């Protein structure tokens, strides 16, 4: 479980750093080309290392209807989330149509899978209280987590002037604590109630979010990296105990179905978090830009002082207004970023309340089915 948590976290952290380096030194095309040798190597490794270890297979009827509804519902949702911000969300007919397809497809999928004997998605796992609570916390928590993670590179590249490599480098410390302490937590979580570990994770996420929400456009890379490191303190307390809590009381094929469903919902949560928080960041930037512009008018002390200073520096009116708009845009994007970081911190604290709905369980009993 600890090793799994490290791979889950390291990938999205190393990705921006490596991707940024490749983009800066070569071209963005190589971000895709590099997957070809990696994919071939992984395929060869799996075929070689797992040879002779095939799982027991049985012939089962394929849930064609359920699979079709899953593709329609989730496919429409993913496509809508990916393009909604560019299309103006529900001002676009395409987004509305995709939303209808997603809602209808997922509702019909839920109804069908509940009564289907050979369901492609085993919804009966939700009868397990800890699975239902745990997978909900994981999905919503990962949505907030990704929202927090995605706005920082946006701010660094649009306001702070970082290139893609250095913005990835600035957020990389988020994984340091996870790599070092995930094995420690994995080996010792049988000693405490898993719920308290999850609560610790949410509390640390909230603290790291709050710290980063105090940054300014004058922040150094060290300031940013410290904030990301503090945020990363919560990662091993979140992923590992929550994964064990989800699997508590499940056995045999239930574990396979539970792992598949929880991984799918976690990925979906990340996609939702990216789409929603990028849109929120954009709209809050527009909001703050409008508010700041309202106060940047002749007659206000700050405006008059700045215009006089720029005039004495030899700038004409066009240059002065261009510089002023740039300063307003910088402050608006910064304030929008800080708003989202603060919001995610509050949401993480709210998540703590729902942890108590899960049944008390220690790590030893939770992992007994593995």
Language-model segments: residues:
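Helix-loop junctions on the cytosolic side of multi-pass membrane transporters
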Residues: 44-61, 111-120, 217, 287, ...
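Small-residue-rich alpha-helical segments with characteristic i,i+4
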Residues: 10-20, 24-25, 224-304
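Hydrophobic/small/kink-forming positions within alpha-helical transmembrane segments
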Residues: 9, 13, 71, 176-180, ...
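Hydrophobic transmembrane architecture of multi-pass small-molecule transporters
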Residues: 41, 266-360, 366-370
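Conserved kink/hinge residues within transmembrane alpha-helices of Major Facilitator Superfamily
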Residues: 16, 182-186, 355
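Short, hydrophobic transmembrane alpha-helix segments
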Residues: 83-89
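Transmembrane core module of solute transporters
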Residues: 2-5, 26-42, 65-67, 78-79, ...
